Amino acid sequence: MTDSKTEAAFKPVELYTDGACSGNPGPGGWAFVLRCPRTLKEIQRSGGQPHTTNNQMELMAVIRGLEALKEPCAVDLYSDSKYVGQGMSSWMAGWKSRGWKRKDGSKLVPVKNVELWQELDQQMQAHRVTYHHVKGHAGHTENELCDKLAVAAYQQYL
């Protein structure tokens, strides 16, 4: 998650993300709020797909948020997705070392959503990303906003 650049080279940003699905699988949406605490500049983006899963939309929200960064950043990522958090902090290194396979008992099987995990891994290379879990639907302002935007994004597919 960290490259050889010094800590001072990383601009601090906050990335809030959420994914939502109507049915799982079903129509889904993703959203992010990206904020620079130094300037208070903020961007919000969202999108959707007609047939997807909640986990795919959670991953897409983080990927699209990281893609929006134009320079190396120290990213504080806030998400209610334990799937994203565990994948980034615990599972991804092992998956990569096994050729993007996961252990299932004594055998190796393909990682679910592997294309998205690989895209996330690629996006993370330029940044220092720190995951922070927030409880969903618990009044966290930015998480609630992302949820609202993600739900609105999939409405067009209903």
From Swiss-Prot:
Q: Does the keyword Hydrolase apply?
A: yes
**Subcellular compartments:** Cytoplasm
- Residues involved in Mg(2+) 2 binding: 18, 147
Annotated ranges, domain RNase H type-1: 9-155
Q: Name one GO biological process term.
A: DNA replication, removal of RNA primer
Query: Which cofactors, if any, are listed as required?
Result: Mg(2+)
KW Metal-binding (keyword) present: yes
Q: Tell me the GO molecular function terms.
A: magnesium ion binding; nucleic acid binding; RNA-DNA hybrid ribonuclease activity
- Main location per the UniProt record: cytoplasm
Question: EC number(s) of the enzyme?
Answer: 3.1.26.4
* Positions with a binding annotation for Mg(2+) 1: 18, 58, 80
Q: How are cofactors bound according to the entry's free-text note?
A: Binds 1 Mg(2+) ion per subunit. May bind a second metal ion at a regulatory site, or after substrate binding.
Which reactions are catalysed by this chain?
Answer: Endonucleolytic cleavage to 5'-phosphomonoester
Keyword set, alphabetical order: Cytoplasm, Endonuclease, Hydrolase, Magnesium, Metal-binding, Nuclease
Which InterPro entries does UniProt cross-reference here? Answer: RNase_H (IPR050092), RNaseH-like_sf (IPR012337), RNaseH_domain (IPR002156), RNaseH_sf (IPR036397), RNaseHI (IPR022892)
Write out the GO cellular component annotations: cytoplasm
Assembly with partners or alone:
Monomer.
Q: What does this protein do?
A: Endonuclease that specifically degrades the RNA of RNA-DNA hybrids.
Q: Which family does it belong to?
A: Belongs to the RNase H family.
Name of this protein: Ribonuclease H
Q: Which organism is it from?
A: Rhodopirellula baltica (strain DSM 10527 / NCIMB 13988 / SH1)
